[in-house]
């Protein structure tokens, strides 16, 4: 059963890598429609399976392939269409819709819990056809990426796309300036030709550094331990008398969903780096309390007597579970997708995002598959593993993840090429906006000891 559930993540990893190029060839919108169709095929295979576990298994993989493509192409399209001042907010909405889907899934499971036949799981799968229909219908109204249109020589369509996104006329001076900036950046990239998979290892153009950062950030999103809570939360709730796992799921889903609304504001108000740093710090504190109370207080007579629990300890752990989910949903849940969608140059974007997102799915598979075995062996000591990962996440973000708030995608690329230290990136100014008192050398280089960089930034 664990493999059937977690194999979905493997399909997602495959789909992101294999299907990401569809968006480069046929456009982001057609790409999204295509991968959604693949997702529907997977759902259809699952819902028609009767006493054939292998058919359901295959359907899970195929639907995962479709979702993997969506996870790459959707943030990609949003980041390329959105105006820079709300780009983070709009990419964050991708995560918000994901949490809404999780919440609705929990509600559906609760509504069908009294069925004891195939109806219980087929209703939830059947609703997936509705979400796919909404997705395809929505693509009819979304403008195509102006960067893709310029790349394939459809300049006038690109201007109309920018016009629609910014709600200004095609002749607006600001729009034309943005168009010229995008076109100039694409022309420079065209001189180097299309990026190959091997070029993702290039350090000269800083592509490898960006791929590495994307992989680590997406991996750390899973290693924050959020899925640990979604899996193990029912055990804690049982300790205080709430034994219905369906109700437990809804409570967690409500906190997760409504916390994501706050992230829509914070990601643009405070910036990507700040959100990730504060998120890692707050989740670290939550795990320290959660794991320590679980190890020392939840079972007064030891883990061998799990039927005897401390309600006070259970209540404390539930409170910090909710704090953790709030901290995760408002920072790392969508923040890593925002940063990855803004980081890569256009010519390497689909491949770079695919690799980074695949890392997320692979860690999702490993955690969902092995968590039952690990928690069965070491119980709440498992929390200290994630605590250690969060310590690493905090320092990694501080030293290696630059701020991209308020910059165009072309300006983000310039910042990477200049080699601006991550802890100084919030002060970096694009060349065309620099004044006489701007000290580029002071921003681009920092010879201070590491501890001084950390405490003075």
Swiss-Prot record:
Cytoplasmic domain ranges by topology: 1-2, 51-60, 109-122, 269-274, 341-353, 401-457
Protein localization: Membrane
Pfam families associated with the record: Sugar_tr (PF00083)
UniProt topology in membrane: Multi-pass membrane protein
UniProt entry keywords in alphabetical sequence: Glycoprotein, Membrane, Repeat, Sugar transport, Transmembrane, Transmembrane helix, Transport
Gene Ontology cellular-component terms listed: membrane
The keyword Transmembrane helix is assigned to this record: yes
Molecular function GO terms recorded: D-glucose transmembrane transporter activity
All ranges on the Extracellular side of the membrane: 24-29, 82-87, 144-247, 296-319, 375-379
Record: glycosylation sites: 194
InterPro entries, alphabetized: MFS_dom, MFS_sugar_transport-like, MFS_Sugar_Transporters, MFS_trans_sf, Sugar/inositol_transpt, Sugar_transporter_CS
Functional note: Probable glucose transporter.
UniProt cross-references to NCBIfam families, sorted A to Z: SP
PANTHER family: GALACTOSE TRANSPORTER-RELATED, PLASTIDIC GLUCOSE TRANSPORTER 4
Sequence similarity: Belongs to the major facilitator superfamily. Sugar transporter (TC 2.A.1.1) family.
Descriptive protein name: Putative hexose transporter 12
Species for this entry: Saccharomyces cerevisiae (strain ATCC 204508 / S288c)
Source species taxonomy: Eukaryota, Fungi, Dikarya, Ascomycota, Saccharomycotina
Gene: HXT12
